[in-house]
Curated annotation (Swiss-Prot):
SUPFAM superfamilies: C2 domain (Calcium/lipid-binding domain, CaLB). GO terms for cellular component: endoplasmic reticulum membrane; endoplasmic reticulum-plasma membrane contact site; plasma membrane. The gene is esyt3. Disulfide bonds: none annotated. It comes from Xenopus tropicalis (Western clawed frog). Ca(2+) 3 binds at residues 425, 427, 429. Residues 331-452, 468-618, 757-879 form the C2 domain. This is Extended synaptotagmin-3. Ca(2+) 2 binds at residues 364, 376, 423-425. Tethers the endoplasmic reticulum to the cell membrane and promotes the formation of appositions between the endoplasmic reticulum and the cell membrane. Binds glycerophospholipids in a barrel-like domain and may play a role in cellular lipid transport. The lineage of its organism: Eukaryota, Metazoa, Chordata, Craniata, Vertebrata.
Length: 889
C-alpha cells in the first residue's frame, strides 16, 4: 500500500476494499495516523466522493448513448429474467413428472423464507435506528423490550460516557479482530480438513456500530462486602460484515448481528494491596438473545426451523463458556485461586411444590367462541438453564398437580423463577399466563406458601409452595430419605487426570478386556486418546467435554447431583476414549465416606481402576446437607409473608394536637358505636400483631395507655398519617394540581360536609420483592358518612399517582348498607421499588349510587406518601378521609 501524503493527497488504493486470496497484506500505515477509512457496508468498493459531498465533473459526451442502451436493456431484461425464474420450477416438475405437491411445498418454503428474512431485516434496522438516536426512540415511544434498561428501571444507571469510550476504541478493535481472523483463525480452519484448504476470509469488517451498555446496576445489599457485583445491560446491533470463500462458487457470510443479554461482572475478592481486585469474573445470567443475518450459501439457514436450530447451536456454544453455571475468570493477582472463583458453591436450592391453579382462562373454544370449552393446562418452570415441565391436566380450569421440583440456584440476586402456563393443543400450545418471582424474598422468608396471580391474562392464579434450602457442611443435619426428596447435594469439581493409558492394551485387566472384545475389535496404536469422563449418581448421568490427544487431560468442569440417601448411593466415574470407545479407567466412590471428612469435602487424586498402574484423576468432591433454616429475626415477614400477620399497631404521638383530635373523634365515634354495635365486626386493628413487634408494643400499651382512650374500648384509633404539601412538591410538580382536582370533585363549602373528619380507611402497603410490585391491601373502613336511611354502599378506588389512566385504576367490591365495610382485597402495581418511593397513592372511598340518584357520591379520600416508610418492611395504618385528601390540621 502506498504511503499517504502528509499534504492530504488522495492515496492510490483506498482502504477497506475486499481482500483477494493472492494479494499481499498491507500492514504499513502513515506515522501518527488514525484508523484508516473503510467502505460503507453496502457501498461500492474503490469509489469515493470528494470532500463536501460534491460529485466529480462528468463529460456529457462520454458514454451517454451506451449508458442509455444499457438502462433500456436492463429494464426489458429484468421482467423477463424474473418470469423465467418463476416458471423454471414449474418446468422442472413437468419435465421429471413430479407431483404438484412439491411445487406447492417449495412455494410455501420460499414464502416463509422471505417473510422471515423481511422480519429479521426490520428488527436489525429498528435496532440501528435506536442506536443512531436513542433519545428520539425513547421520546417517540417504542415497545418496552426495545427501550434501554435505564428507561424502564430507575435503579439502572445510564453510562453514556462508557459507550463513548467504546465507540472511540471500536475502529482499533476492528483492526485487531481483522488481523486475528486472517492470521490465526484462517490457518486453523484450513488445517482442520482437506476440503477447506482454500478457505479464505475475503472481507472482515466489524462495521461502524459498536456494542452499547444500556445500563449498569450495582448491588450493595445482601452481598458479600469483599466483592463488587455489576450487571451490564449489553446490546450489540452490529453492521458487521464477514465474507468467506472456499472455492470460487462457494461463498458465504454474515451481514448484521444482534446480541442482547445481561452480563454480570464480579470483582472479587477485594484486596488491601494493588491491584485491589483479585480477579474479574464474567458470565451471562440468562441465555442471551442472538439474531444473525446470513448471506451467500448460508441463506439456507434463514429457512424457518433451520434458522432457530442454527442460532440455538451458536447460543449453546456461548452458553458452554459464558452462561451460568459457566463463568469466565481473569485472575489479576497471584494470591487468589482461579478455580475457586470459576466454580463457587451454589447459593442454595429452591424446592418448588406446584400444587394447583384456579380460574384459568378457557382456550379450547368452538364455533369462534360461541361454544366455550376448557383448557388442558400444563406448567413450565424455569430458573436459568434449568427447565421442568409438569404433566398435563385434561379439560380442567382448576387443575391440581401436586408435583415437586428442585432447582440449583447459583446467583441471588440475579436469577428468578419463571412460571409459564400453557394449554396443550395438537398444533400450537396456547398461552394461559406467566409469573416471575424474585428469589431474594424467598431466601429471606425461607418458606413461602402463597397464591400468585398470573400476568398478561384476564384471570388465573397458581398455588406454589417455595422452600429455600441452605447448603450446610454438617452431617448431624442430615435427615432420613423419604418420598424421593433430596437430603443432600454432591458437587464434583473435575480437574484433570494423569498417566492415562493410550488404549486398553496398556493395562492388564483380562476380565474387563475380554468382556469388551466380545463385541468390538480394537487396533493397537500409539496415538494419544481423546478422553472424556462419564459420571453418574443414581439415575442421573453427565458427560464432560472431550480433551483431544493427551494422556494428561485437563477438563476444569463442575457438576452437581441431588442425593436422596447418602448411605446407599455411590459416585460412579468412567474415563473413556471418544475415538475408540474404550474405557481408560474407572472409579466407584461410596458417598458415606465423605461423612467422616472435614467439612464433608475430599480434595485429592483418586487412583483409577482398570487403568494404568499410576493413573489417577484429580477431583474435589463436596457434600452439602440440604436444610431449611429458620429465618433471621430481623428479616421475619419482610418478604411476601409480611401481610399474613395482619396490621402492625402504631403508637400515637403524645402531642396536644393529637389530644384534641382524639377528643373530637372519640365523641363522634361513640355516637356511631352505640347505633351499630350489634352489626359491626371487631376492627382489624385488634388483630394479632406481627412477631417482631408484639412484645414491645404489648408492654407499651399496657403501661402507657393513650390519653382520652378507654383501655377496654375496641374502637381505638391509631394516629392518622397524611402527607403534607412539601413532599407533594418533591414528588412531581404535576401533582400540585391534585388540590384543584379534589376541589372539583368535593365542594368544601357544601353544608352537607361535617366539620370533622368523614371516616377512616385502613390500608396495608408493602413492596413485594418476589413479584417486583407494590402490594396494596384495602382492609376496611369505619365511621363513614351516612348517605341514606340504609347507610351507604361504599367501595374504594385506588390510583398510583401521577397515573390516572383508566387502565391503572383499581377498585374494590361494593359493600351494601354499611358504614363499616370489611374488604380485605389485595391489589398490585407493577413498578420498581425505587420508582414506588417517588409515587403517591390516591385512595378514595365512594358511594355506589344508582342512576339518577341524588345521594352523595364521594365519601372522602386520602393521599398516601410512599416515600416516608420502609416499603419492603411494609406498614398498616388508619387514614382519615377528607374532601381533598390532605390533612385537616
Amino acid at each position: 500500500m502506498a504511503q499517504g501524503d502528509p499534504g492530504g493527497q488522495t492515496p492510490q488504493a483506498p482502504q477497506g476494499t475486499d481482500k483477494k486470496p493472492d494479494e499481499p497484506k498491507a500492514t504499513e500505515k502513515p506515522q501518527g495516523a488514525g484508523p484508516q477509512p473503510r467502505d460503507p457496508p453496502g457501498g461500492e468498493k474503490g469509489l469515493r466522493d470528494p470532500p463536501g459531498g460534491e460529485k466529480g465533473p462528468r463529460d456529457p459526451g462520454q458514454g451517454g448513448a451506451g449508458e442509455a442502451l444499457a438502462e433500456a436493456l436492463y429494464g426489458l431484461g429484468r421482467p423477463v429474467l424474473r418470469a423465467v425464474l418463476y416458471l423454471f420450477p414449474v418446468y422442472l416438475c413437468g419435465r421429471f413428472g413430479l407431483s404438484p405437491t412439491w411445487l406447492l411445498f417449495g412455494l410455501f418454503l420460499w414464502m416463509f423464507w422471505t417473510r422471515n428474512k423481511k422480519f429479521k431485516l426490520a428488527r436489525i434496522q429498528a435496532a440501528w435506528d435506536l442506536h443512531e438516536n436513542e433519545k428520539l426512540g425513547v421520546t417517540r415511544g417504542l415497545y418496552l423490550q426495545q427501550l434501554p434498561a435505564w428507561v424502564n428501571f430507575p435503579d439502572v444507571e445510564r453510562v453514556e460516557w462508557l459507550n463513548k469510550v467504546v465507540g472511540q476504541m471500536w475502529p482499533y478493535i476492528g483492526m485487531y479482530v481483522e488481523k486475528m481472523f486472517q492470521d490465526k483463525v484462517e490457518p486453523l480452519v484450513r488445517s482442520s480438513s482437506a476440503h477447506l484448504k482454500a478457505f479464505t476470509f475475503t472481507k472482515v469488517h466489524l462495521g461502524e456500530k459498536f456494542p452499547r451498555i444500556n445500563g449498569v446496576k450495582s448491588y450493595t445489599k445482601n452481598v458479600d462486602k469483599r466483592e463488587v457485583i455489576l450487571d451490564l445491560q449489553l446490546s450489540y446491533n452490529g453492521d458487521v460484515e464477514i465474507n468467506v470463500e472456499v472455492k470460487k462458487m462457494c461463498k458465504a457470510g454474515v451481514k448484521g448481528v444482534q446480541l442482547h443479554g445481561t452480563l454480570r461482572v464480579i470483582l472479587a475478592p477485594l484486596l488491601p494491596d494493588l491491584p485491589f481486585v483479585g480477579a474479574v469474573t464474567m458470565f451471562f445470567i440468562q441465555r442471551p438473545h442472538l439474531d444473525i443475518n446470513w448471506t451467500g450459501l448460508t441463506n439456507v439457514l434463514e429457512i424457518p426451523g433451520v434458522s432457530d436450530f442454527s442460532d440455538s447451536m451458536i447460543v449453546d456454544m456461548i452458553a458452554s463458556h459464558l452462561v451460568l453455571p459457566n463463568r469466565f475468570t481473569v485472575p489479576l493477582s497471584s494470591q487468589v485461586q482461579a478455580a475457586q472463583l470459576r466454580f463457587p458453591l451454589p447459593h442454595g436450592v429452591l424446592r418448588l411444590h406446584l400444587i394447583e391453579a384456579e380460574d384459568l382462562i378457557p382456550k379450547d373454544n368452538y364455533l369462534k367462541g360461541i361454544i366455550r370449552g376448557k383448557s388442558d393446562p400444563y406448567a413450565v418452570l424455569r430458573i436459568g438453564n434449568q427447565n421442568f415441565k409438569s404433566r398435563t391436566i385434561k379439560e380442567n380450569l382448576n387443575p391440581k398437580w401436586g408435583e415437586m421440583y428442585e432447582f440449583v440456584v447459583h446467583e441471588v440476586p440475579g436469577q428468578d423463577l419463571e412460571v409459564d402456563l400453557y394449554d396443550e393443543d395438537p398444533d400450537k400450545d396456547d398461552f394461559l399466563g406467566s409469573l416471575v418471582i424474585g428469589l431474594e424474598g424467598v431466601m429471606q422468608d425461607r418458606v413461602v406458601d402463597e397464591w400468585f396471580p398470573l400476568s398478561d391474562v384476564p384471570s388465573g392464579s397458581v398455588h406454589l409452595r417455595l422452600e429455600w434450602l441452605s447448603l450446610l457442611p454438617k452431617s448431624e443435619k442430615l435427615s432420613e430419605a423419604k418420598g424421593g426428596i433430596s437430603t443432600a447435594m454432591l458437587i464434583v469439581y473435575l480437574d484433570s487426570a494423569s498417566a492415562l493409558p493410550r488404549n486398553h492394551f496398556e493395562y492388564s485387566s483380562s476380565e474387563y478386556t475380554t468382556r469388551k472384545q466380545r463385541h468390538m475389535t480394537y487396533t493397537k496404536t500409539d496415538k494419544d486418546p481423546n478422553s472424556y469422563v462419564l459420571m453418574s449418581v443414581g439415575k442421573k448421568s453427565v458427560k464432560s467435554k472431550t480433551c483431544t490427544g493427551s494422556t494428561e487431560p485437563v477438563w476444569g468442569q463442575a457438576f452437581a447431583f441431588f442425593i436422596q440417601d447418602v448411605h446407599m448411593q455411590h459416585l460412579h466415574l468412567e474415563v473413556k476414549d471418544s475415538e475408540r470407545q474404550c474405557a481408560l479407567g474407572m472409579l466407584d466412590l461410596p458417598l458415606h465416606r465423605l461423612l467422616g471428612n472435614e467439612e464433608l469435602t475430599a480434595d485429592q487424586r483418586f487412583p483409577l481402576a482398570n487403568s494404568g498402574p499410576n493413573s489417577t484423576i484429580k477431583m474435589k468432591i463436596v457434600l452439602r446437607v440440604l436444610h431449611v433454616e429458620a429465618p433471621e429475626p430481623e428479616s421475619i415477614y419482610t418478604g411476601i409473608n409480611s401481610l399474613k400477620q395482619g396490621p402492625v399497631s402504631i403508637k400515637r404521638a403524645q402531642s396536644q394536637q393529637h389530644k384534641s383530635h382524639g377528643k373530637s373523634h372519640q365523641a363522634h365515634h361513640q355516637a356511631h358505636q352505640t347505633q351499630q354495635n350489634h352489626t359491626v365486626q371487631q376492627p382489624k386493628a385488634e388483630r394479632k400483631e406481627s412477631i417482631s413487634t408484639t412484645s414491645q408494643q404489648a408492654n407499651t400499651s399496657s403501661s402507657n395507655p393513650a390519653p382520652n382512650q378507654n383501655p377496654n374500648s375496641t374502637g381505638a384509633v391509631p394516629e392518622s398519617h397524611t402527607p403534607s404539601l412539601k413532599p407533594l412538591e418533591r414528588i412531581a410538580p404535576s401533582l400540585l394540581s391534585l388540590n384543584s382536582i379534589g376541589s372539583s370533585v368535593f365542594d368544601p363549602n357544601d353544608k352537607r360536609w361535617p366539620s370533622e373528619m368523614t371516616g377512616e380507611v385502613e390500608v396495608s402497603v408493602r413492596y413485594a420483592s418476589l413479584r417486583r410490585c407494590l402490594v396494596v391491601l384495602i382492609n376496611s373502613c369505619r365511621n363513614l358518612i351516612q348517605c341514606s336511611s340504609n347507610g351507604a354502599d361504599p367501595y374504594v378506588r385506588i390510583y398510583l399517582l401521577p397515573d390516572r389512566k383508566w387502565s391503572g385504576r383499581k377498585k374494590t367490591s361494593v359493600k351494601r348498607k354499611t358504614l363499616n365495610p370489611q374488604y380485605n382485597e389485595r391489589f398490585e402495581f407493577l413498578v420498581s421499588q425505587e420508582e414506588a418511593k417517588k409515587r403517591m397513592l390516591d385512595v378514595a372511598v365512594k358511594n355506589n349510587r344508582g342512576f339518577g340518584s341524588h345521594e352523595r357520591k364521594e365519601l372522602g379520600k386520602v393521599l398516601v406518601d410512599l416515600s416516608c416508610d420502609d416499603l419492603v418492611k411494609g406498614f398498616t395504618k388508619w387514614f382519615e378521609l377528607t374532601p381533598t385528601g390532605l390533612p385537616t390540621s
